[in-house]
Every structure is written in C-alpha cells, then in structure tokens.
Amino acid sequence: MKRIGLILMAVFLTLACAACGQEKGTEKMKPATKTASASALTEGKGDHKALVVYFSASGNTAKLAKTMAETLQADLLELQPAEPYTSHDLDYNTAGTRATVEQRDESARPKIAGNIGDLKQYDTVYIGYPIWWSLAPRIVYTFVESVDLSGKKVIPFCTSGGSGMGSSGEALAAVSKGKGNWARGREFSPNASAAQIKEWADKL
C-alpha cells in the first residue's frame, strides 16, 4: 500500500511539473516600450559662456558635437525628440515616412523632450545638425523658435552625406525673427579633429 502511494505521488509531481513547463513555454513576452529621453545639459570645463546644441539621428552629428564641446570647453545640450525616430521614420528613400513628411512641411515643428531651460548665461551658441534634404531637421527649427537668442552669437554647423551645408544656416536665422547675431557656419566630417575645430572657431 505504501509503495502504491509513493508511485501515485511520483506520477502527480511529474504531471504538475509538465503543466508548469507548458505554461512558461507559451507565455508571450510584452513588447518593449520605446520612450523618449529628456534633452539633457552636460556642463563643460569652461566658464559656461558657450553652448553646443545638437540634434543627431545616426550618431554622426553627436560625435562631432561632443568633440566640439570638449575642444571649446563649452556646455553641451542634445535635443531629444519627444517622439523618438525609428529606422522606418528615417527612410529617406520612401515617400510618406516621418522625416520625409516633416521636411516637406515648412510648418512642421516636432516637439522636443524635456525642458530646454534658460540660455541667458551663454554668449555664444553653436547649433549642430545633420543635413536632411538640404536643410536642418525640423526639430532644430523648434529649438530656434522656442529660445531667446537675443544678443548671442549663433554659429550653425552640420554633418552631411556630401550635399554640404547649403543655405541651412540662413534658413534657421530666418525663423529666429532677428534674434541672435548669426555667423556663417560650415560642414564638418563627424571625425573632425580638435585642431580643425579650434582653427575654425578662432576665425569666427
């Protein structure tokens, strides 16, 4: 009788373990939620009178902006979109994708995540961006229109796939409504050296 009881218990445990394993095997993973990071300021080693602001989709402009901020001992501010761009959004070769639609719409102003804050302490503001369809991405327009650049020297810079800076800087200056003393910017390679950046900045 005792032996039969042990056999029944073993059978019960085996069935229980099998059921448990089946439940785990069919459990569906929840899709990851894509969230926006707030735009954040990184303080440089200088006197906090110069600020490098940038938007980067692929990382090229980010690399350049970080080298520039370190070289010029400037504070660094990355513009993060409230709605992050996906790979599909950035498919420039497909009509109807987000980036294509935004760039074709002169009134498009994508929201920036987080609070930009007050720029009063800065005398010089460098604004970096990739070139999209010969212009700065519309989120950079959002930034220019949402801050007070009065009395500041404003210097645009960019990375591109070969199209050059074009009139992208002038287009940004136009939406600033006369605020800021805009200098002519230039295109850089993402791998620009500190020496190249310093030589350029010293001539501004």
Where are the regions that the model predicts?
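Typically the conserved alpha-helix immediately C-terminal to a functionally engaged Cys/Sec
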Residues: 139-145
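Short Gly/Pro-enriched loop/turn and capping motifs at secondary-structure junctions
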Residues: 131-134, 149, 160-164
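Positively charged n-region of N-terminal signal peptides that target proteins for export
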Residues: 1-4
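N-terminal beta1-alpha1-beta2 submodule of the flavodoxin-like/Rossmannoid cofactor-binding fold
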Residues: 21-123, 127, 134-136, 178, ...
